[in-house]
Amino acid sequence: LEDMELMTWAIFQSGQKIPAKIYSKILAQWDQYSHQMANFHETYDILLTPTVADVAPKHGQFALSENLQNQLKHMADFDWPKQQELIWEMFADSLDWTPFTQQANLTGQPSISLPVYRDEQGLSLGVQLTAAKGREDLLLHLTQQMEECSVFS
């Protein structure tokens, strides 16, 4: 635990106890999501979404409670269902704020987040561009075009 961030360590511990049947099912679901996105990209070059659902959060807004941190430190002592409950609790508050970014993490697609607007307080709002697997070149080319048009704020 000294050489690993607490949330990463907790996820690692949960992975040690995941039943093989469930692990296989999860991998199959990830493959299905990847296939669906590959089909999407046969028609569309880019998926455009907001990066997040709002402006930047306040510092510490999604900080883990002391109680949750203590439970995570003892993650190895819990059975797998309890571990899953704690992992969900780790992310639950922030998922409403970042509903769009997980997809690329699950499917392995290249994505880029770009600041395209500033609100009245100067906080950036961004868009996320997601391309098909292996099409990082498309993201870089589009980003260059946007930069040349002074789109970034």
PLM features: residue spans?
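Structural helix-boundary/capping segments
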Residues: 18, 24, 90-100, 105-153
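Short helix-loop capping/hinge segments that flank enzyme active sites or metal/cofactor-binding pockets
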Residues: 1-38, 54-83, 115-116, 120-123
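Aromatic-anchored helix/helix-loop segment that forms the rim or "lid"
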Residues: 72-102
